[in-house]
Amino acid sequence: MKRKGFTMRLTMLGTGHALATKCYNACFALQDDAMGKAPGCTFLVDAGGGNGILTQLERAGIDWHSIHDLFVTHTHVDHLLGSVWILRVVCYGMECGNYQGEFHFWGNDEVVAAADNLAHMLLRPSESAFIGKRVFLHAVEDDGTTQILGRPVTFFDIRSTGSAKQFGFAMEYSAGKVLACSGDEPLTSENFSHVEGATWLVHEAYCRHADIDRYNPHPIHHGTVREACATAEHLSVENLVLYHTEDDDLAHRKERYLAEGRSVYGGNLHVPDDLEAFEL
């Protein structure tokens, strides 16, 4: 049942691909605004490739103390390494006594193993000591479910064609309303059932289809604006958010991507800049 005054907010902390230099790597936050700045009101999805995640959180007005759940889609550096910095500040906060409660890290078995190894190699022993005590690393499985922000979440294996196992998720954030994310590869037919009829879909689009010969996204397991929009149209997605893009012309990215996408997609198409937010 929808709570009085309830608002779920989606903030795109980063919108760029792995080697982006003019915007941050693709990642976003989901917040239950009804909880204000109370502990546990922020769910972080991926964290980019470095401590720039701390800058993006600060610029977005998101207190890292409010993050109690982090999901990392796969082990590529532009998604995983920023999570080490999240673990760093959380564990340090616990050590100093100013971080309340537990922290839950979600990812497939490859992600969890990598995060565990990096944390024990790179954090001080007094920080990594919280892993397994108040910081819990959860290896998710295909069609596995949990509760995050008090809402049901289903994880799914995207059947990656790339070099790393990758998972997406679908969250029912309000009765009958679903937000889904398919990671940084095009959604495949094996997972259409998780996304069909979704209220919001966060999906990669490396470049415009008009620029496919310039960027050649398919060999690196990415797709185009037109392809992502055609999939969203086929699945009757209400709102499509494109991210994980090239960053060669950010000043015109939005208008050019929108023009191509709207030719095949009749829903609400969004091509956000870094730090752009949406009320769901």
Kindly give the residue locations of the regions a language model identified.
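Active-site neighborhood of phospho(di)ester-bond hydrolases with catalytic His/Asp-centered motifs
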Residues: 44-48, 67-75, 108, 179-183, ...
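Active-site-proximal loop/helix segment associated with metal-binding centers of metalloenzymes
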Residues: 20-23, 139-194, 198-210
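Cap/insert and terminal regions of metallo-dependent hydrolase folds
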Residues: 186-275
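Metallo-beta-lactamase
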Residues: 99-165, 274
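Short gly/ser/thr-rich secondary-structure transition/capping motifs
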Residues: 52-54, 134-138, 180-186, 222
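Conserved beta-strand hairpin/beta-sheet module of binuclear metal-dependent hydrolase folds
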Residues: 4-60, 165-183
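Active-site metal-binding motif and surrounding structural segment of the metallo-beta-lactamase
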Residues: 51-103
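Divalent metal-coordination and catalytic microenvironments
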Residues: 10, 46, 57, 74, ...
